[in-house]
Design a protein with these regions (language model features):
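Canonical Rossmann dinucleotide-binding motif of NAD(H)/NADP(H)-dependent dehydrogenases/reductases
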Residues: 1-29
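Conserved glycine-rich Rossmann-like NAD(P)H-binding loop of the short-chain dehydrogenase/reductase
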Residues: 24-40
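The beta1-alpha1 cofactor-binding region of Rossmann-like NAD(H)/NADP(H)-dependent oxidoreductases
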Residues: 35-36, 55-67, 99
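Substrate-binding pocket helix/loop in short-chain dehydrogenase/reductase
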Residues: 93-94, 98-103
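Active-site helix of classical SDR
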Residues: 117, 153
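Residue(s) in the substrate-gating loop at a strand-loop-helix junction
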Residues: 137
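SDR active-site lid
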Residues: 170-235
C-alpha cells in the first residue's frame, strides 16, 4: 500500500485529492488545522476504499510540519507522496492590503510549502525516492490584478518546484506543480477582501469554474503518475499561458487598457461568468 501526506485535506481541493488516491487504495495522512473537517475526510477516504489517519498541523509553524514529517517516517514507514496543498487568499490593490494580510498569505502559502519540502526531503532521500506535489495556481503564472499576495506566493511556489525538480532528480524524487484556474473550492471560506467588487469577483470566478475540485484533482494525480512537472488543468489556463509567453505586452495590455477606460472590473466579471477565468 502506498502512503501519502496531504496538507489542507480537511476540505476542498485537499479532500478531493485524498479521495482520488483513496479509490486507488492509498493510505493517507490527512493534515489540517480543522479537526472536524479532517474526520469528515477520513470517513470519506475509508468509504472510497482507502485507509488513513488525521494529523493536526499548522503549516505556518515549522515545528508542526517537522513533527508531522518525523511521525510520517517513524518506525521505518515510507512517504511515497507529499502534497503541499494548504493555502489562503487575500484580495485588494497592493498598497491597500494590510501588511498583516500579506504576512498571513506568505506564512501559509510560501513558508508552509517550503517547510513541507524542507522537512520531508531528507526522509525521501533516505528511503530512496518519492514524489512531491506542490499546489500553486494559474495566478502564479498570470498575476491577476487585485490578488497580489496570492500571485506572489504562488509564483514563488512554481519557482521552488522548478528548482527542486532539478535538485532532486538524482535522488529519484519527482516534483510536480499544479496550476489550476478558478474552480469551486473552500478557499472562499477564509478569503480576505478589501471591497465588495473583490468579493463579487471571487464568488463569480469560483462559481463559474469549468471543472470541479475532483476533476482538477484527477488531472493532477494523472500528471504525477506520468512524472510531469507542470499541470495546468483547464483549457483556458493553457490558452492564457501560451498567449502570455508569445506576447506579454498584448496579454497585459488588454487588461491595462480596460482599467484605464474604467471598465476593467466589468471585463473581469464578464470573463468569470463565461468561464474564461
Amino acid at each position: 500500500m502506498s502512503n501519502a501526506v496531504i496538507t489542507g485535506a480537511g476540505s476542498g481541493f485537499g479532500r478531493a485529492l485524498a479521495l482520488v488516491l483513496a479509490r486507488q487504495g492509498w493510505k493517507i495522512l490527512i493534515a489540517d488545522i480543522n479537526r472536524a473537517g479532517m474526520e469528515e475526510t477520513l470517513a470519506m477516504v475509508r468509504k472510497a476504499g482507502g485507509e488513513g489517519e488525521v494529523f493536526e498541523c499548522d503549516v505556518s509553524k515549522k515545528e508542526d510540519v517537522q513533527h508531522m514529517a518525523d511521525y510520517s517516517f517513524s518506525t521505518g514507514k515510507r512517504v511515497d507522496l507529499l502534497i503541499n496543498n494548504a493555502g489562503v487568499v487575500s484580495c485588494g490593490f497592493v498598497g491597500d492590503i494590510p501588511l498583516e494580510d500579506w504576512k498571513w498569505c506568505v506564512d501559509i502559502n510560501f513558508w508552509g510549502m517550503l517547510y513541507g519540502c524542507h522537512s520531508f526531503i531528507p526522509g525521501m532521500k533516505k528511503q530512496g525516492g518519492g514524489h512531491i506535489i506542490n499546489v500553486a495556481s494559474s495566478a502564479g503564472l498570470f498575476s491577476f490584478m487585485e490578488m497580489g499576495p496570492y500571485n506572489v506566493t504562488k509564483a514563488a511556489i512554481i519557482s521552488l518546484s522548478e528548482t527542486l525538480r532539478q535538485e532532486l532528480a538524482l535522488h529519484k524524487i519527482g516534483v510536480t506543480v499544479t496550476c489550476p484556474m478558478f474552480f469551486n473550492t473552500h478557499l472562499l471560506d477564509n478569503m480576505r477582501f478589501q471591497d465588495e467588487f473583490q468579493n463579487e469577483f471571487a464568488h463569480s470566478a469560483f462559481k463559474h469554474g469549468r471543472l470541479t475540485a475532483e476533476e482538477v484533482a484527477e488531472k493532477t494525480i494523472r500528471a504525477y503518475e506520468k512524472n510531469k512537472l507542470y499541470v495546468i488543468p483547464q483549457f483556458t489556463g493553457k490558452y492564457y499561458w501560451i498567449l502570455k509567453r508569445l506576447s506579454p505586452s498584448i496579454f497585459y495590455g488588454v487588461i491595462s487598457y480596460a482599467m484605464k477606460k474604467g471598465y476593467g472590473e466589468k471585463l473581469a466579471l464578464f470573463l468569470t461568468r463565461i468561464g474564461m477565468m
